[in-house]
Amino acid sequence: MEGGRGGGDGNFLPNSNFGVFSDSAMDMDFMDELLFDGCWLETTDGKSLKQTMGQQVSDSTTMNDNNNNSYLYGYQYAENLSQDHISNEETGRKFPPIPPGFLKIEDLSNQVPFDQSAVMSSAQAEKFLLEESEGGRRYWIAPRTSQGPSSSVKERLVQAIEGLNEEVQDKDFLIQIWLPIQQEGKNFLTTSEQPHFFNPKYSSLKRYRDVSVAYNFLADEDSKESVGLPGRVFLKKLPEWTPDVRFFRSEEYPRIKEAEQCDVRGSLALPVFERGSGTCLGVVEIVTTTQKMNYRPELDNICKALESVNLRSSRSLNPPSREFLQVYNEFYYAALPEVSEFLTLVCRVYDLPLALTWAPCARQGKVGSRHSDENFSECVSTVDDACIVPDHQSRHFLEACSEHHLLQGEGIVGKAFNATKLFFVPEVTTFSKTNYPLAHHAKISGLHAALAVPLKNKFNSSVEFVLEFFFPKACLDTEAQQDMLKSLSATLQQDFRSLNLFIDKELELEVVFPVREEVVFAENPLINAGTGEDMKPLPLEEISQEDSSWISHMIKANEKGKGVSLSWEYQKEEPKEEFMLTSGWDNNQIGSGHNNFLSEAEQFQKVTNSGLRIDMDPSFESASFGVGQTLLGSRRPGEKRRTKTEKTIGLEVLRQYFAGSLKDAAKSIGVCPTTLKRICRQHGITRWPSRKIKKVGHSLKKLQLVIDSVQGVQGSIQLDSFYTSFPELSSPHMSGTGTSFKNPNAQTENGVSAQGTAAAPKSPPSSSCSHSSGSSTCCSTGANQSTNTGTTSNTVTTLMAENASAILKRARSEVRLHTMNQDETKSLSRTLSHKTFSEHPLFENPPRLPENSSRKLKAGGASKVKATFGEAKVRFTLLPTWGFRELQHEIARRFNIDNIAPFDLKYLDDDKEWVLLTCEADLEECIDIYRSSQSRTIKISVHEASQVKLGGSFGSIGLGPSL
């Protein structure tokens, strides 16, 4: 016998590291090493070994015929590796012939251009290649890496499926194997003639099995054709599962039509590896007729079944060392309570259904089914102890996230780790599963918009965690999402506190919209997969039929390699709000499926109707989108543009609509509410006047003094002048003569001419009384308007005295110019700035939060509160979205009060008197006093409840819309 010497015409070259052995005694370990690598065996007496070898192969591959399961198919062959010299021996069982063009798993070493050594070792184990020559006969014994039974990959997969059969035999499961073949010069995955199992009670699974046999999926790395679910798993070497295959797009799951017809729902696919090798040998697929969110039992069962036959699926091969985890855990677990407390606060204040904390798996010491040596350092997963789930339905999504780890770059969380930016997705369910792997689970849980925020280490600025906030399920409107995004960003800026972590306020924010990848697939993939016939991708023009759509402009800009930004502009003294916009997760081209794409973009089309501007900027090679303008030409960076209508809407025009709601006024003027709010801010109006005030205890004179104290007002503003255009309304308590109700919208062009100029308001009636968008009554006597504040106050006082039996509430308009504190840094909730390029940070001149001193009040609506309970005192921020109940909870939490009900809250008013705070109306009045007095802090005292309780608040109506 000689080892390691090539010769003859054999197809395989032996290992030639060892020379010819001498006749001396050899070390047995060295001999084992030699045989382990393979060797040639040669005879010199001319005796043929064909018959002997055929018998050996047949004996080694014979199956046990006692296992007669008509729904479990496995095929064992002694392969004809050298057609000129070896006859094909069948095993003891008879099987249908394999059609020409389909190669068997044992032929992989010759036909599939993967890792030849690894494939040969698994597929050629215990197989022999013979050569004949005049001098004798020789044959090659291939190396055997497996320490398990002498069997092929297919044999072992059959055994593994038999083991799975015991676990799922009574369930509605179809288990099938996909193995690689070569056809027409391309590599494919096929399940035809491969092992499979299904429960015969479910005829739909039998039909779906027949459908799957007709499909071949490409297994080439550089293919642009649809690879399907098995192909993705095979190429990426990562498992993939979905709760419902109907959520796939047709290019992601070409069998989707047949799956719907066969009532197929859940699907799980795992790659199969030889133990100790990184070469993927095939894919195990499980489908079921039920919708499944949790596949952990099936994952564990498949992994155990594969390990029992010396195969494996994905797993972590190199977990972090114990020393690393011990050092990191000191930092890691110290930060979790801080993160959890902050997420709890945010979820309670904004009514979020879910808030997740993500961290690298390596730093958690967490293992998962998607791990490998190559990606373990890039894998991230949820920190379950730091996830807040107020919504019960969202708990299933948390379980899915804990089970399905993400790689850096996948989803907005993976991108936040990778790019160190804030990422916002208006609708997560519109993304493909490749771009957002948890999109299907989010759809079942009813989740939509999400924001990913990276948390950095204060010492080295590395990203330690990523927080993922899911917006309320009802927050679907673009404007509502914008308001929520700004308000939530203000909270992130102002209220996050940690010893070791911080949120970088100079980060950019990217708003990500879905864009399809260009893929090609055939209706009959078995016929056309190799030729590519009748597979034409839809052109870009078919994706969006309307050239005016800002989505189509954005897509075209992205296709040309241009950056795209989304901006909301405010007044000149405020920084421009600008959001980075990416049209997908990578730079893939846009392809087929225009109908579905349009449906995904419908939610953003509303913005166009509100006056969204699109600017193609040649200097930046970017598209800028802003509120309030139509399609314009290029402009230089930093320039501001306004529509003619917006420029010409003055204070006189606004006054005509103060009696009604802000939304009605916006509709009448012809702008969206957001634009109207901005116009009001330009005129110094920070809150729409027609809101409901609950108490009459403060005179209009005090309000007039506040208004007069504001610098920069052009001309004197009198309170009674705001209501001269109120509609007439008859009242038995009023002395007015008019009895008809006149609609202020009856003015020409709603108070604005066709050219956008203000129409002259009608002369005011001598006396009028009106109900303003609620139950509050507003009165004015404008026959002889006076600029004297005392006259206005006396007039209202006289009316109140004459109508003591009527319910009369104080009417007041808060008019403050935005020039107050111009030099002070604007709050994030109003001036959040997101720039397209790195030189424009997320926050222009971002406010730094001092570590050991209280922060200045910002202009975003948040209020400082100082609460006292006995000798204890605390300070905190009253967010603009809080109500009385949230204030109670925060005070109870700060003072560790289990039940706040037995306690009374009192606030210090402008007369230095303690007034009970019992409801929303009282809280609103408290905030009004705080703002009117220019006080920096709201003072609240907590007392034990008194025996005598006062009656309910007079007219509890909520605050008007905040500007």
Curated annotation (Swiss-Prot):
Domain PB1: 862-945
Keywords: DNA-binding, Nucleus, Transcription, Transcription regulation
Chain residue ranges for the region called Disordered: 734-794
GO BP term, pick one: regulation of DNA-templated transcription
Biased composition annotated in UniProt, kind: Low complexity: 756-794
An example Gene Ontology molecular-function term: DNA-binding transcription factor activity
GO cellular component: nucleus
CDD domains with a match to the protein in the record: PB1_NLP
Domain of life: Eukaryota
Compositional bias segments (type: Polar residues): 734-755
Record-annotated RWP-RK domain positions: 635-716
Entry annotated with the keyword Nucleus: yes
Signal peptide location: none
Keyword Repressor applies: no
Main location: nucleus
Subcellular location: Nucleus
Disulfide bonds: none
Entries under InterPro entries matching the protein: NLP (IPR045012), NLP1-9_GAF (IPR055081), PB1-like (IPR053793), PB1_dom (IPR000270), PB1_NLP (IPR034891), RWP-RK_dom (IPR003035)
Pfam families hit by this protein: GAF_NLP (PF22922), PB1 (PF00564), RWP-RK (PF02042)
Job description of the protein: Probable transcription factor.
Protein name: Protein NLP2
